[in-house]
Structures are given as structure tokens and as C-alpha cells.
């Protein structure tokens, strides 16, 4: 702890950019490295989950990411469930963003588009398209809308439910309605639930005790895109937050005699090196936003914005153009080949090489790799 003033202390925390991986074992061939992981009954060949935003995930994007071994999470409260002509609406949004450099112009239009009511039939049809392709189907809902939307999604045939907000606690209390008790809610479902975001050990442990199969660390923070720090004064030191959640996972494992809850890191991960650092800090998988927005399959055509940007009264994000011109296919973003010397392409290939250089063959072992702090 450090003193920030008389009688007020704060904890020193670390970002992913402040730590480094320390290879200290015999190196291995990257061909011998496995990046597979399993969430409940569902196995994935790569530890990559798409951030649930309309900028990325359409049914077609989710299908392609699933085919490549990852998980695409559809935003259950996004434009896909509100507009039949969602591609036209997004084209209108991108045109507004490109025409006016003032961020509020595009945000106002995004808010207007989100003011349309959710259509369960549209949402169900999107889920059905993903499910029919034979890949794992996951949809994100907010804690506020989980109780009424979940039955619709379960009936449509989802495999995984993601309950995600900027911050999620084990119980959501509201004076204008019934509180959402996640433990009771999850126990009544027949499908696994992933919940988040959390920023510390205590909240992560509380969420694990609700019966969640996975816990999300962070809220998808991205410099220049998410503005939760500016709006709420809340930011996430991802290296520390991931390590804290991993410690909560160990504590819960001991507490329950063997129940393992997966930790998913969501925020400030843009390169293969940052992906590797997130796993090294204790994450089982990462939730990616801007790196995947560069792909040709992304619905936002090179633009990115978080779901929180559409909040009707307090938007916490902006639209940012990530890629211009011809964009690489998702397969190349994840698996290469790459001509980017800064780690923006071949993300999983970079992770494999990092694991091999450090002498580890699987993700859980790699969580034990040595780390140093710079500065």
C-alpha cells in the first residue's frame, strides 16, 4: 500500500505493459504447444472469445470464429435483436462516424438505434443461425435484463449465457424492481453461465460462489474507445486484476474441493504479446475487441465500439476506426501468416511461440511462468 495523502492509502497495481514473461525452462517447438481449453462441456482450440459488440459479432462472424476454434459472443441487447436490416443500420452509423469527427454525433445515432425495442424473434433467428452451423452458441445479456431475456435465449437454443456489465456483483440491488441474485438465478438454469466484469479478488470470489462457470475480469477497456475511466473514474490494471482473480480461483478450488472456475481477461489486450501476458498472469482465455475488428468478417467494417457506448444516458465508449482499406480474414488475424512486426496479426501463433520459448506445452502450465515488473 502507498499513502496518497494523510489517512488515505491505495494499492500499487500493474498493467500488462509493465510486466514481462521470463523464460526459465528448456525451450520447446511451438508445434508441440496446445492452446486448447474447456469451459464446462465445451472445448475450444484457442483461448479467444470475441467481445460482445455489434462492431464484431454477427451470426456469420460467430460461426467463423467458432470454426477457427474460438467463441463468438452475440450481444443479446444489440442492434441484431432490434433491427431486421442491421447491416444497413450499421452502414448508416459508420457513415455518420466518418463524416463528423465529433464523437457525440455517432453516439447519438447509436443511442437512437438502440432505442428500438428488442424483438425476441430476431434474436432467436440469429441464435438459430449460429446453432445450425454446429459451433458453440453464446449470447451476452446485462444484469438488468437477464431475467426476462434468458428464457427467450434458452428457448432459442444457446449453449452458454454471458451476464456482463461494466461491474457485476453476486447480487444486483435496485429500488425499482426485484434484486437479481445470481446464485439463485444460475442454479435454476441448465446451461453454464459466465459473469463479469470484476476488478478484484473479493468480487471474483463472490461471483465464483454463485455457480458461474467462468468469471470475466475487466470491461473491455481500450484506449481511445472505452471511456469508463473518464465517465466513472473506474479503470482496470489488468495484470493485477487477472492475478487477483486467479488467486480467487485457487481459493475457491480449495473451498469446494475441486470446482474450477475459468478466468477470462477482457481489456487492454491488443497484441499477441499482451495475450501471452494475460495467460501468464492467470487467465484461461482472453476476450478480444479491437484486434478482431481488423478482420474482414467483423460487422463494423474496421470500426470498433463497446456495448456500453450505446447507453441511453451515460455512454462509456466511442466509435474508433481500427482498420482502413483491405482487411485480413479472421483466420489470418488469429493464425497468420503475419507481416505485422508489432504483434497485431497471428495472435495465437504469437502465444504459441511465447509458450514454447518459455518451455510450456499447455495453458494451465503457462500460468506458472515467471514474471518481472519493469521500471
From Swiss-Prot:
This enzyme's EC code(s): 1.-.-.-
Superkingdom as given in the UniProt entry: Bacteria
GO CC annotation terms, alphabetical: plasma membrane
Keywords: NAD, Oxidoreductase
Ranges that cross the membrane: none
Single GO BP term: GTP biosynthetic process
Pfam families the UniProt entry points to: IMPDH
Molecular function terms, GO-annotated: oxidoreductase activity
Note: Was identified as a high-confidence drug target.
Function text: Has no inosine-5'-monophosphate dehydrogenase activity.
Recorded family membership: Belongs to the IMPDH/GMPR family.
Protein name, UniProt field: Uncharacterized oxidoreductase Rv3410c
Species, as recorded: Mycobacterium tuberculosis (strain ATCC 25618 / H37Rv)
Upper lineage: Bacteria, Bacillati, Actinomycetota, Actinomycetes, Mycobacteriales
Gene that specifies this protein: guaB3
